[in-house]
């Protein structure tokens, strides 16, 4: 069975975006994102797909959209999370990585079995996209790693991995 895995970076108030862009510069988090997703299918919304500027190489780029249109070559339109899961399953993928935005996270959260969250130690002014609140009692933290800000990483971060209770 293909697991639904949410991957996101969020601030203290769950902000994940501003003006269709990431509101921070975190080089190490981008490297971590690549390591977590390379070779796996991705599910994203249309705005997230547009913000990427291109299809991410080495990954199947699935865009959840009602219109059936995708912004860039190398991306595929899907009409539902079920369709995305079917495609991932047909490819033999163990995980379907959900990478945003806010509406897609909210849609997928009830079915997700794992989350890789980057907790960014800041509060974004003017944020307009948010990761959904979730019931901590339904999740078990299985890993946490702290990193300090430096010349390539604008803020302190914590990488936290959660597994839904009963799914580990």
Predicted regions mapped to residue ranges:
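Flexible, gly/pro- and Lys/Arg-enriched active-site loops
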Residues: 4-168
């Amino acid at each position: 069975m293909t697991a639904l895995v949410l991957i996101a970076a969020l601030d203290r108030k769950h902000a994940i975006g501003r003006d269709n862009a990431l509101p921070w510069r975190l080089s190490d988090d981008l490297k971590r994102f690549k390591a977590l997703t390379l070779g796996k299918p991705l599910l994203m919304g249309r705005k997230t797909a547009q913000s990427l500027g291109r299809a991410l190489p080495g990954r199947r780029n699935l865009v959840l959209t009602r219109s059936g249109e995708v912004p860039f070559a190398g991306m595929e339109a899907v009409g539902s999370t079920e369709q995305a899961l079917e495609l991932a399953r047909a490819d033999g993928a163990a995980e379907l990585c959900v990478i945003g935005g806010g509406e897609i996270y909210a849609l997928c959260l009830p079915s997700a079995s794992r989350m890789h969250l980057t907790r960014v130690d800041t509060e974004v002014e003017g944020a307009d996209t948010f990761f959904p609140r979730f019931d901590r009692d339904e999740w078990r933290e299985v890993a946490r790693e702290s990193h300090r800000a430096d010349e390539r990483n604008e803020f302190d971060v914590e990488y936290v991995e959660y597994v839904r209770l009963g799914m580990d």
